[in-house]
Amino acid sequence: MQTLSSILRTIAPLDSKAMARATTRLDGLLKPQGSLGRLEQLAIQLAGMRGLYGHQVDRKQIIVMAADHGVYDEGVAISPRVVTMVQALNMVRGVTGVCVLAANAGAEVKIVDVGIDSDTLPGVIDMKVARGSGNIARGAAMTRQQAEDLLIASATLTLQQAAGGVKVFGVGELGMANTTPAAAMVSVFTDSDPELAVGIGANFPSEQLHHKVAVVRRAIETNQPDASDGIDVLAKVGGFDLVGMTGVMLGAAAAGLPVVLDGFLSYASALAACRIEAKVRDYLIPSHLSAEKGAVIALNHLQLEPYLQMGMRLGEGSGAALAMHLVDAACAMYNNMGSLAESNIELPGCVN
């Protein structure tokens, strides 16, 4: 069995020489240099990932981590707790938002139970740590050992999927009340006041946001997470779904493969992943700007600029599914465009 240290040791920086070669190729394609903007930058980023060869991304997969949260008992969500289980089963049926959007993008969806308050669910990968995390307003979400074990299990699952041929990963989550621990994590990692990180989540009444802010503030004061220690923050004020997504990011980076972020929840996990191993950031592809209040703070801290701005806050991996189309487009552009030299065209400043 792998250890967390052994997984982290395999995470390498992007290949700068491969990226330079990709830049030269892009500059010689049938277009003015840089005219495809961030699509070119995405192709260059992908070129630096050792797990990809020839910009071939034919197999894409979104891993959705599902779990319930003890902080639900503080009245920070309006959806019934059982919705986590119901939606997990709906994902198995392929009828949720992420499933429809992923199918449209040619991506698979894997739903993983890391802490749903239910018995084993058919069609769902069982990696359950417990039936819900601890109530972070009154104590830790989990033990440090539970967090480390789940990071290893999630990263190992990702590495296994990579060995089976997956070339692009996306992350998603499912769990009632999970924007509360995510806001706590973002607040801690960015050293921001909880009021700046707490949003309405799944339509939480705006007039009650002060209560949600107070719960997040109490969680941080109660647990005193160490912002310099990603695992400590996950264990004290996170949740099993947030830990699971962090593990997917570590595993994808260890495999030298891209991982497409989703929304606010995934930003919280990305902050943890980058705190655990800074090189993970090289492998992150930001999909969309979440409509959640703390999104900009988190993304600014990560120094990531999302590709899409759709006003979305569904979660599940829905934004990751949309951005899979951009990954395909970047690779199609890189592989299939003709060159200036082939057409005997010379443009000022272009490489023939």
Curated annotation (Swiss-Prot):
UniProt GO BP: cobalamin biosynthetic process
EC code: 2.4.2.21
Keywords: Cobalamin biosynthesis, Glycosyltransferase, Transferase
Catalytic activity: 5,6-dimethylbenzimidazole + nicotinate beta-D-ribonucleotide = alpha-ribazole 5'-phosphate + nicotinate + H(+)
Annotated pathway: Nucleoside biosynthesis; alpha-ribazole biosynthesis; alpha-ribazole from 5,6-dimethylbenzimidazole: step 1/2
Active site: E316 (proton acceptor)
Enzyme class: transferase
Gene3D superfamilies per record: 1.10.1610.10, 3.40.50.10210
Gene Ontology MF annotations: nicotinate-nucleotide-dimethylbenzimidazole phosphoribosyltransferase activity
Keyword Endoplasmic reticulum among record annotations: no
The UniProt record lists the keyword Lipid metabolism: no
Record's function text: Catalyzes the synthesis of alpha-ribazole-5'-phosphate from nicotinate mononucleotide (NAMN) and 5,6-dimethylbenzimidazole (DMB).
Family: Belongs to the CobT family.
Protein name from the UniProt record: Nicotinate-nucleotide--dimethylbenzimidazole phosphoribosyltransferase
Gene name for this UniProt entry: cobT
